[in-house]
UniProtKB/Swiss-Prot annotation:
Acidic residues composition bias: residue spans: 886-905
SUPFAM superfamilies found in the cross-reference section: GyrA/ParC C-terminal domain-like, Type II DNA topoisomerase
GO biological process per UniProt: DNA topological change; DNA-templated DNA replication
UniProt-listed Enzyme Commission number(s): 5.6.2.2
Other remarks on this protein: Few gyrases are as efficient as E.coli at forming negative supercoils. Not all organisms have 2 type II topoisomerases; in organisms with a single type II topoisomerase this enzyme also has to decatenate newly replicated chromosomes.
Organism, scientific name: Rickettsia conorii (strain ATCC VR-613 / Malish 7)
Motif placement: GyrA-box: 551-557
Classification via Pfam families: DNA_gyraseA_C, DNA_topoisoIV
Reactions mediated catalytically: ATP-dependent breakage, passage and rejoining of double-stranded DNA
Protein's name in the database: DNA gyrase subunit A
Length: 905
């Protein structure tokens, strides 16, 4: 290396050089490529395309031109980058599904919502859209500054004098270095109304702007769920907006329905959406779809989803929302360049920046027009003086040797200006007046006089000259008023905005559904009573309650399940499609789910494994499902009572399980040889009844247990068990305040009479032969509960809850049912009402539904009556109650086959 070359080298620290170079690169990307300007809402490439088309005269009123020519002009003059980047930007500005107000009018294939690419630029044609002219209007009036292009051969505008807030109307998106922007499109009319509100009151609150700017207005329509994301975006510049496609449900006959999707969320690929739905159906994550086809055409989107027979369309639609991009979110980052620097702005700041920019544009335009008007008035003043002194003017011209001599003579001569002195003052043309108040022609005026045609000397032309001068003076006066009054300037700004609104505003496409939608999608689900069935093998299903018909006690039943021999039903309960449920597993985890999300089936259907519905771990299975009240306030006042097979109990606050993650939450710690028997909601003034398979029961108050906050506690001893015995049921009863003596006295009244008293029938206390007063008897009758006990061999009975004395927890309990080999062990104990119905399921899947009014009420220490005829080897495995419904009332003709009166044992 020579000394000369080495002397040109400057040693630098590589760390410093990296910092400087990377910062330069980052700012170049931010300012010159990826981030739009808050004033016109355009990135450099879009601005250059619009300006180049305007310069080339490629306006909306002119014929289309090849897109390749437009791209070539932009690339050659202003944007020395790849032609594909320019063409892609041009294509997007022509897509009516990408921009709310397309800025380019394209002819040919400009892509589709399916993600199809546009045709090559040599095939497509383009021109400016009509609204695009509002971006460049007045650009020739020195409204914005110009900068040299990349090689200094041309000049390009640093910003377009946009007459509407394009950043909000069409939105923008881009990824720079270390930052990104994602601004949704809005409705032009709403945005202009917001600008007018801001012009009227610069101190307006953002929430007041939200009264007119309802939210984004996407070109693809669809819906926005809730306003919390909108408020966050407009207040802070950042937020997440939930978008949902629009779908309709149609009846297509034969108990079949179809879902018709007519609008999809913004920027969602329609073809990919259809593929995703098909994929979810194949994976059985979406059930009930029999056919799927895309029937979209030039008239709009139409995705046809045909459903299987008797499938609830709302459920399938919600599954589609949950599993596909038919419902997605738009992350708002309102980042734009303000004064050349990137800044996240709220709605008011964006509008304020635009209004401030338009003030500058109108001011610059007014100054330009004022100067032009004064220049023209200057000439007209000279012509007016010349016409008034035409004879002398002609003499000077005739006496001059040439035009230059004539011009110099005209300029040297002083002319009387008394008759036009007021006009000169209005025009503010001080150059024409000397100290004596006389006028001297300027070179411009002298030249105009020499070029004046003789026809201007006619009387009509003289009058026209004076009229033109007066009109110019009016214009100049108006321009001076604008420049001297900000109020007048803002009036013009508003007038121009309103004109743009009147010409280009369109109705809102995107509707906003108000409310909270975290858990409210079940509002689309029809309220229907469902029977939920759970099997030992971990299968679960829901079946409409109307699918089961009522039978009388002793009937043979109907097939309720179609299962393999090794699978049996373990739990059945009835709830609404809107019922929230907690799922408790064998390892002490708890999960949350709404009932309508369970797979819909028929009485013979097997259902679906719970491992496919809940995120269960290896060797984990659900042991208990607890339906909760639908009312949130009612749930907030409840506790949860846990009961295990070994007799342990624990009282917890239901609020501890209010918010559950998708992967569940620890509910209780269990010993290896113990299992969770039941979990039920309870209140402070209620009682707990634990029942064992050996026919024992223990009743104690809920308030005797303290609330345990630790979810990892295994609780305290609830009941002392004999060897081989275990707890099989936990029942929540009403609290009672009567004494044992009063309860015993009340129970001495025949149960038939007690039921009549509870119905409001008149009675004579003396005839009952008890020491209780009539009000006490009525109160106890109205509060009386009955306990149903069912055994594995189909025996059952109802007993008054008053017969179960209240003791402390931890005892051995009292006899609940007299069991023997004929009755078998107890499988279910629960409180019942007179109008309830009983549902029993056997290990073979057979099911019977009968009214409880046919089950006799007996004493506590009895064996009951036969409820269900069993075949050899058949056992009752599940017991559930069904409240009386419209379906059962309609089914008044009950089956009479195989009915037998059973006798009390």
């Amino acid at each position: 290396m020579t000394d000369k070359s080495s002397s040109n080298l400057v040693p630098v620290n590589i760390e410093d050089e990296m910092k400087v170079s990377y910062l330069d690169y980052a700012m170049s990307v931010i300012v010159s490529r990826a981030i739009p300007d808050v004033r016109d809402g355009l990135k450099p490439v879009h601005r250059r395309i619009i300006y180049s088309m305007h310069e080339a005269g490629n306006h909306a009123s002119k014929p289309y031109r090849k897109s390749a020519r437009i791209v070539g002009d932009v690339m050659g003059k202003y944007h020395p980058h790849g032609d594909s980047a320019i063409y892609d930007a041009l294509v997007r500005m022509a897509q009516d599904f990408s921009l709310r107000l397309p800025l380019v009018d394209g002819q040919g294939n400009f892509g589709s919502m399916d993600g199809d690419a546009a045709a090559a630029m040599r095939y497509t044609e383009s021109r400016m859209a009509k609204v695009s002219y509002k971006l460049v209007e007045d650009i020739d009036k020195e409204t914005v500054s110009f900068n040299p292009n990349y090689d200094g051969s041309e000049e390009e505008p640093s910003v377009l004098p946009a007459m509407f807030p394009n950043l909000l109307v069409n939105g923008s998106g881009g990824i720079a270095v270390g930052m990104a922007t994602n601004i949704p499109p809005h409705n032009l009319g709403e945005v202009i109304d917001a600008c007018c509100l801001y012009i009227d009151n610069n101190d307006i609150e953002i929430l007041d702007l939200l009264e007119v700017v309802k939210g984004p207005d996407f070109p693809t329509g669809s819906m926005i769920l809730g306003i919390s994301g909108i408020r966050s975006a407009y207040l802070t510049g950042r937020g997440s907006i939930i978008m949902r496609g629009r779908a309709e449900i149609e009846n297509i006959g034969n108990n079949r329905q179809a879902i018709i999707i007519t609008e999809i969320p913004y920027m969602v690929n329609k073809a990919r959406l259809v593929e995703k739905i098909a994929e979810m159906v194949k994976e059985k994550r979406i059930e009930g779809i029999s056919d799927l086809r895309d029937e979209s055409n030039k008239n709009g989107v139409r995705i046809f989803i045909e459903l299987k027979k008797d499938v609830v369309a709302e459920v399938v639609l919600n599954q589609i929302y949950a599993c596909t991009q038919l419902q997605t979110s738009f992350g708002v980052i309102m980042l734009a360049l303000k004064d050349g620097l990137p800044k996240v702005m709220n709605l008011k700041e964006v509008i304020a920046a635009f209004v401030s920019f338009r003030e500058v544009v109108i001011t610059n335009r007014t100054i330009y027009l004022l100067n032009k008007a004064r220049d023209r008035a200057h000439i007209l003043l000279g012509l007016t003086i010349a016409v008034s002194n035409i004879d002398e003017i002609i003499r000077i011209i005739k006496a001059s040797n040439d035009s230059n001599a004539a011009k110099q003579e005209l300029m040297a001569r002083q002319w009387e200006a008394l008759n036009i002195l007021p006009l000169v003052k209005l025009v503010d043309d001080k150059a024409m007046l000397n100290e004596q108040g006389k006028c001297n022609f300027t070179e411009v005026q002298a030249k105009a006089i020499l070029e004046m045609r003789l026809q201007r000397l006619t009387a009509m032309e003289k009058n026209k000259l004076e009229e033109d001068l007066k009109n110019l003076i009016t214009e100049i006066t108006e321009y001076l008023n604008i420049l001297g009054s900000r109020t007048r300037l803002l009036e013009i700004l508003k007038e121009e905005l309103i004109k743009v609104k009147e010409e280009f505003a369109t109705p809102r496409l995107t509707s906003i559904e108000f409310g909270e939608f975290d858990q409210d999608i079940e509002d689309l689900i029809q309220r229907e009573e469902m029977v939920v069935t759970v099997t030992l093998g971990g299968y679960i299903k829901r079946v409409p309650l109307s699918s089961y018909r009522a039978q009388k006690r002793g009937g043979k039943g109907r097939s309720g399940l179609s299962m393999r021999d090794e699978d049996i039903t373990t739990q059945v309960f009835v709830g609404s499609t809107h019922t929230p449920m907690l799922f408790f597993s064998n390892i002490g985890q708890v999960y949350s789910l709404k009932l309508y999300k369970l797979p819909l089936s028929n009485p013979q259907g097997k259902g679906r494994p719970m491992v496919n519905i809940l995120p269960l771990k290896a060797n984990e299975h659900i042991t208990n499902i607890m339906p909760l009240p639908e009312n949130q306030d009612e749930r907030d006042n409840l506790n949860i009572m846990f009961a295990t097979a070994k007799g342990n109990i624990r009282r917890s606050d239901l609020l501890d399980f209010k918010k559950l993650q998708s992967n569940g939450k620890i509910a209780i710690r269990l010993d290896e040889d113990d299992k969770l028997i039941d979990v039920k909601p309870c209140k402070e003034d209620e009682h707990i009844l634990l029942a064992t398979k050996a026919g024992k029961a223990l009743r104690f108050p809920v308030e005797s247990l303290r609330v345990i906050k630790s979810r990892t506690s295994d609780g305290v001893r609830g009941m002392k068990l004999a060897k081989e015995d275990s707890v099989i049921s936990m029942t929540v009863l009403k609290g009672i305040s009567s004494t044992k003596e009063d309860r015993d006295a009340y129970l001495s009244v025949p149960w038939e009479q007690r039921l009549e008293i509870a119905k409001g029938e008149a009675f004579n206390p003396e005839e009952l032969g008890v020491s209780l007063t009539a009000p006490a008897i009525v109160e106890m009758a109205n509060s009386e509960e009955f306990i149903l006990t069912v055994t594995e061999n189909g025996f059952g009975k109802r007993s008054s809850a008053y017969g179960y004395r209240i003791t402390d927890r931890g005892g051995s309990g009292i006899i609940n049912m007299d069991i023997n080999d004929k009755t078998g062990l107890v499988v279910g104990v629960m409180p019942v009402k007179m109008d309830d119905e009983l549902m029993l399921i056997t290990n073979s899947g057979k099911l019977i539904r009968c009214k409880l009014e046919s089950v006799r009420i007996t004493g506590r220490n009895t064996s009951g009556v036969i409820l269900f005829k069993l075949d050899d080897g058949e056992k009752v495995v599940s017991v559930s109650l069904i409240a009386e419904t419209a379906e059962s009332e309609e089914d008044s003709e009950l089956e009479e086959e195989g009915l037998e009166q059973s006798e009390e044992v």
